[in-house]
């Protein structure tokens, strides 16, 4: 806080992304007073009381809100902890696993929202071109038709993820020549960590198109994405739980990953099953559409 106050350049994290904030002279004076009070704080409660106004002046989502004060409680790793961390990186991660987690963290942020946009736009284009009635009239069952399109969409959207994984693997190989690397780490991370999020966001695209027949589903997915990002921002170096985007934005904290691996596995399995449920609901709606019993839920302004 002392450095940020001196530079009048504060960092907040609305929606999980860094934002620079500059304060007025009056607000700067209030931060200076809060800084003096924080220096004299000898309990967490008094520290929260001193720094709470700073968070309010910055518009919230800063390191100075009560929920984030534990970030200031830092201690050096002991020699035993450092050796354990190093052993996990070298023997279990085999170096590439460490980078693969960071890759999966960032890739998941992207695939949580982008596939929904692509699929809704894809379905909207079909509707504008009046392709949907022709396809629905053909003698192909709804399950086969939907699963084929879904699988093709997932495969197409996964290709850029795999290509990025390949490029990053090559970079790590160049950084650590002769090291015993796990050459499959990035691809395992793509399948285990990133793919379930991709499956859900793709399924949301098809479901929202069947449900609304417009771009309403995109707004709903943005809301889900923002909520997930804000929750995950509280602990980006290791936060799994039931987040659609499990966070591990660090090359370290390896012990946390292996200690919570089962939690992450349950999370990924749960979202894979959720994608299947969304696909099943889409199938039901599409059957109703083919039978002429449902034409989509449309939001219209109220008549005067």
Predicted regions and their residues:
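Membrane-embedded or membrane-proximal helical elements that form or frame transporter/channel pores
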Residues: 1-58, 81-116
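Terminal transmembrane helical anchor/hairpin motif
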Residues: 1-22, 86-91, 95, 221-304
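Secretory targeting signals
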Residues: 53-115, 121-122, 147-214
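Transmembrane helix boundary and interhelical loop/hinge segments in multi-pass membrane proteins
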Residues: 119-136
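Membrane-interfacial segments
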Residues: 124-128, 167, 171-179, 212, ...
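Alpha-helix N-cap/start motif
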Residues: 142-143
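Functionally important transmembrane alpha-helices
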Residues: 208-228
């Amino acid at each position: 806080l002392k450095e940020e106050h001196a530079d009048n350049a504060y960092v907040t994290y609305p929606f999980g992304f860094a934002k620079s904030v500059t304060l007025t002279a009056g607000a700067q004076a209030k931060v200076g007073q809060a800084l003096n009070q924080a220096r004299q704080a000898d309990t967490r409660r008094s520290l929260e009381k001193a720094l709470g106004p700073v968070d309010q002046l910055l518009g919230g989502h800063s390191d100075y809100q009560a929920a984030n004060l534990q970030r200031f409680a830092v201690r050096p790793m002991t020699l035993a902890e450092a050796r354990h961390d190093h052993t996990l990186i070298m023997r279990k991660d085999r170096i590439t696993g460490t980078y693969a987690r960071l890759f999966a963290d960032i890739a998941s942020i992207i695939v949580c929202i982008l596939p929904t946009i692509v699929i809704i736009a894809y379905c909207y284009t079909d509707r504008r071109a009046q392709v949907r009635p022709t396809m629905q009239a053909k003698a192909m069952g709804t399950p086969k038709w939907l699963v084929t399109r879904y699988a093709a969409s997932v495969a197409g959207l996964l290709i850029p993820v795999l290509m990025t994984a390949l490029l990053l693997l090559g970079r790590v190989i160049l950084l650590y020549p002769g090291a015993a690397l796990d050459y499959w780490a990035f691809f395992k991370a793509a399948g285990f960590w990133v793919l379930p999020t991709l499956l859900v966001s793709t399924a949301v695209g098809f479901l929202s198109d069947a449900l609304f027949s417009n771009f309403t589903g995109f707004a709903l997915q943005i809301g889900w994405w923002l909520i997930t990002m804000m929750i995950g921002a509280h602990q980006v170096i290791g936060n799994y739980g039931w987040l659609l985007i499990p966070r591990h934005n660090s090359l370290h904290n390896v012990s946390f990953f292996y200690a919570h691996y089962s939690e992450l596995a349950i999370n990924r399995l749960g979202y894979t099953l959720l994608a299947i449920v969304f696909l099943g609901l889409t199938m039901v709606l599409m059957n109703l559409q083919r039978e002429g019993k449902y034409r989509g839920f449309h939001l219209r302004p109220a008549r005067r």
